[in-house]
Amino acid sequence: MTDSIDRRAVLRNASLLVTGAVLSRAVAAQQAAPAPLPPFPGFTAHDIPTSGGVTIHAVKGGSGPPLLLLHGAPQTHYTWRDVAPRLAEEFTVVAADLRGYGDSSQPQGLPDHSNYSKRAMAQDQIDVMRSFGFERFALVGQDRGGRVAHRMTLDHPDAVTKAVFIDIVPTYYLYTHVTLAFIQAYPHWFNLVQPSPAGENSAVALQGPANAPSPAQLEYRRRNSTPEGRHSMCEDYRAAASIDLEHDAADLDRRIRCPVNVLWAADGAMDRLYDVLAIWRERARNVTGKGMPGGHNMQEGAPNEVLAELQSFLRA
C-alpha cells in the first residue's frame, strides 16, 4: 500500500514538474518573441478596417501611380523589404499583409472556408486601396498573393491597370492537372488542407529552420507561427481546394483584361513542370514573362533582378 501511494505521489510530482517545465518554456518563448519590425524607410504603417469585418495591416510610402504588393506564405509584407523602398521612388507603394497573415486579422475559418476565399481576400485589398483614395492601381502578387491578385483581376477588372504574378500558375489548373511530380514538389498543398488539427500540425514545418533564424524568418514567425496564424494559413489552402475552385470553375470562360507579366523561378518546380506562359495565355489576353533567378521567393533571393523587371513592365 505504501509502495502504491509512493508511486502515485512520484507520478503526480513528475507530472507537475513536466507541466511546469512546459509552461516555463511557453512563457519564455512568449517573452522572447520579437517586437514588430518598423515600417520600411519612408513608409508609414496603417491598420485598415474592411467591409469583410477584418482589419488589414499595410505599409505605404512613395509618390506616383499607386501600386499594391501582396506576399506569399508563410511570409508577410516584409518580404518586399528590398524592393518596395526602391519602387517607392516612382510609385505610391502599398505593401499589405493578407487576411490571416502578419498583423492583419486572423479570423476563425468558417465551415465552408469562404472567409478565406481569394474572393474575400481580394475584396480586403480593394478596400485597403480605396481607403487611400485609389480606385485603380497596378498589382504585384507572389505565391498566395498572386492567387489573390488573380482573383482580383477577375472580380474587379476596372480596378487593376496591370498585374504581375510571381511563381504561380492558376489554382484551378493545378488541381485539375494533379501529377505525382506536382505532389512531390508541393506536398503542403495536400497536407495543409487536412481537417484541423492535422493541417495545423503540418504547418509547423513551413516556419523555417529552428536554429539561427534570420531576422526575416523571426518576423514571419512572430504572428504566422502562432496557433491562430497556422490555422489561418491552413484555411487559405483549404479555401483554395474548395470554394476557390468553385469560383474559378464559374469563371473559366473569362479572361483577364489588363496586361499581365508572369515571373517564375527558372530553376524551380514551375519551370520544370509547366509551360507557364502558355497556361497564362489561356487565362489572359495580354501576357508576357520570363524565368528568373532567386528561387520561389525571388523578391528576396534576387531583388535587383525582380526590381528591374517590375520597373520595366510597370513603366511601359
Positions of predicted regions on the chain:
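Active-site helix-initiating loop/hinge in glycosyltransferases
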Residues: G72, G301-A302
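Structural motif
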Residues: T50-S51
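Conserved HGGG/HGGXW glycine-rich cap/lid loop of the alpha/beta-hydrolase fold
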Residues: K60-Q106
